[in-house]
Amino acid sequence: GSIPFWIALIASFSVFLQGVKVKAPTFEITNKCPYTVWAAAFPGGGKQLAQGQSWSVQPDAGTSTGRIWGRTDCSFDGSGRGTCQSGDCNGTLNCQGDASAPVTLVEYTHNPSMNLDFYDISLLDGFNLPLSITPTSTNPNCKGIITCLSDINSQCPNELKVSGGCLSACVKYNTDDHCCRGANCNQTLYSRFFKEQCPQAYSYAKDDVTSAFTCPSGTDYKIVFCGKSDHIFALYLYITINNEE
């Protein structure tokens, strides 16, 4: 699939970063789904999570971009080789590459030169499970509890349905319009479907206004599969954001 416009833009600035490598954010990933999820991070690897289990991912210092997601219905042998019905990453438990569609993605760009983290939930490769991301910061400039908790799989248009999830139209049809290739692109009927289900998530590549979120550098994050974070900061941020609207 395509990538959000802001990631391409911010990543271009990262080329110019020089000097000391800065600590990347830590991500605490928790599975609240009533089934096992094989969490994945690139960079970061992978881990099997039963319901209620967590995994802390700390990318190497200097890491500028990454993706985190959940895999479903996986089977791995003792060497960590196998397959997943959704979110598979080259048949390995310890991910060393991107996910196979359909998959619900958390994407981040860490840019210390701007003193900002950029993060989002992307449905550009489709949807396989609900999730949320919550920054663990009380900084008022850190606005962005993002959720995509709709049961998209049960609502998925028949032509996009596959085992384990719901494909995006870009992955399914690979056309310029659906994949937002070229100088200008607009919503399609399919991207509107995803946006209606998850208003805070990317539904097409230039969906930046309502889908790109920032926090000051130094912020860590909680990602929850099938639920919201119950962290105290979630309530604080919700109150802060709504009081300022």
Curated annotation (Swiss-Prot):
Signal peptide boundaries: 1-19
Tissue specificity of this protein: Mostly expressed in strobili, and, to a lower extent, in roots of seedlings and saplings.
Glycosylation sites: 90, 186
One GO BP annotation of this record: defense response
Disulfide bonds listed in the record: 33-226, 74-84, 89-95, 142-215, 148-198, 156-166, 170-179, 180-185
Induction summary: Strongly induced by arachidonic acid.
InterPro entries associated with the record: Osmotin/thaumatin-like_sf, Thaumatin
Lineage top rank: taxon: Eukaryota
Protein name: Pathogenesis-related thaumatin-like protein 3.6
A Pfam family the protein falls into: Thaumatin
Similarity section: Belongs to the thaumatin family.
Function per UniProt: May be involved in disease resistance.
Keywords: Allergen, Disulfide bond, Glycoprotein, Pathogenesis-related protein, Plant defense, Signal, Stress response
Higher taxonomy: Eukaryota, Viridiplantae, Streptophyta, Embryophyta, Tracheophyta
